[in-house]
Amino acid sequence: MKQPSALSALVEALRVLPGVGPKSAQRMAYHLMQHDREGAERLGRSLLFATEHLQHCEKCNTFTEAQICEVCSDDERDPTLLCVVETPADQIMLEQTMTYRGLYFVLMGRLSPLDGIGPKEIHFDRLVRRASDGVVKEVVLATNFTNEGEATAHYLGQTLKARGLAVTRLARGVPVGGELEYVDAGTIARAMLDRRTM
């Protein structure tokens, strides 16, 4: 038996989400149609609203409903610090620490030549213009500690240092509450190398 075309279209639409394969998409579609049609309608309205109202901040490239986001509009922030992150989710995580009071630039990705993602796709030119505005003194590279994130940080760091900017990288190490017995050797090694005086 062939499933209705409307259901097939829903399954295919759900597959655009990261980590959602054909089986998961089919389960989600059937759940929404069988048990939560109201939720399905709310999901559809929310997706439509988001695509119509969200845009990229003109300064930092994060998602916003205005031309300039809330963080970039905040006069209390330190404009001499610019933290570079891969995604808006990374920015939110840093904000939740309440330890950073500078500004941001969101790359919306990371360098991955095998996937066709180069400097243009991560808005490299915009970042360089922003960092070279004469106000920024330090660029904090907060890309993830994956191979692509490290390559991105290296590429950005070399280019920004050549422009006379101070470039720093987030430290790596043992997580808060972590026990050495359960931490991988690479993390422990990095924590040992990045140790500081007390």
Swiss-Prot record:
Protein family per UniProt: Belongs to the RecR family.
Toprim domain span: 80-175
Role description: May play a role in DNA repair. It seems to be involved in an RecBC-independent recombinational process of DNA repair. It may act with RecF and RecO.
NCBIfam families assigned to the protein according to its UniProt record, in alphabetical order: recR (TIGR00615)
Protein name, UniProt field: Recombination protein RecR
GO MF term set: DNA binding; zinc ion binding
Provenance organism: Burkholderia ambifaria (strain MC40-6)
One Pfam family hit: RecR_C
Record bears the keyword DNA damage: yes
GO aspect biological process, one term: DNA recombination
Zinc-finger ranges (C4-type): 57-72
Keywords from the UniProt entry: DNA damage, DNA recombination, DNA repair, Metal-binding, Zinc, Zinc-finger
Cross-referenced PROSITE patterns: RECR, TOPRIM
PANTHER family for this protein: RECOMBINATION PROTEIN RECR (PTHR30446:SF0)
